[in-house]
A protein has these predicted regions:
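C-terminal substrate-binding/catalytic lobe of Rossmann-fold NAD(P)-dependent oxidoreductases
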Residues: 1-125
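NAD(P)-dependent Rossmann-like dehydrogenase/reductase catalytic/cofactor-binding core
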Residues: 104-164
């Protein structure tokens, strides 16, 4: 949906601008979707996207105000432990000096970039995670199909369909 040269866009003036030479602020439905999936977060987060001239990798930049004090080192240790344990293959962890193209073809949901995050203090942190929004997403759809194949019954509740 992104134009390669400046042209008229009915939807959004900025999206009509040339993609190859611009970073274009845009909207995202991700925060709204998270609120639907995790009701406790509904209305507590927002977000935006930037259309940038890159092949297919995206990055998430999330700023948290923490309920209790913790150090950035403790956060890194917890993410690393999860990436090597219960979330192995889903959550990645890196301390390498990475750029977007390093994640092309990565099937994991996201890869935490330990060197890119920062802590303003022990209650306010910024975390960065990369993901392949084409290959990674396709792999998550395959995971979902495999899971659905094991489910005996599908129930509908309000707006959500869930497996039982």
């Amino acid at each position: 949906s992104q134009r390669t040269v400046d042209a008229h866009s009915k939807k959004d003036w900025r999206l009509g601008r040339a993609s190859a030479g611009n970073i274009i602020p845009s909207t995202t439905g991700a925060a709204k979707a998270v609120g639907k999936i995790i009701p406790e977060l509904n209305g507590k987060l927002t977000g935006m996207s930037f259309r940038i001239p890159t092949l297919d990798i995206s990055v998430v930049d999330v700023t948290f105000r923490l309920a209790q004090e913790t150090t950035y080192e403790e956060i890194k240790a917890a993410v690393r432990e999860a990436s090597e344990g219960e979330l192995k293959g889903i959550l990645g962890y890196t301390e390498e000096e990475v750029v977007s193209s390093d994640f092309i073809g990565d099937a994991r949901t996201c890869i935490f970039d330990a060197k890119a995050g920062i802590a303003l203090n022990n209650k306010f942190v910024k975390l960065i995670a990369w993901y392949d929004n084409e290959w990674g997403y396709s792999n998550k759809m395959l995971d979902l199909i495999a899971h659905m194949a094991t489910v005996k019954e599908i129930k509908k509740v309000k707006h959500l369909t869930y497996c039982n």
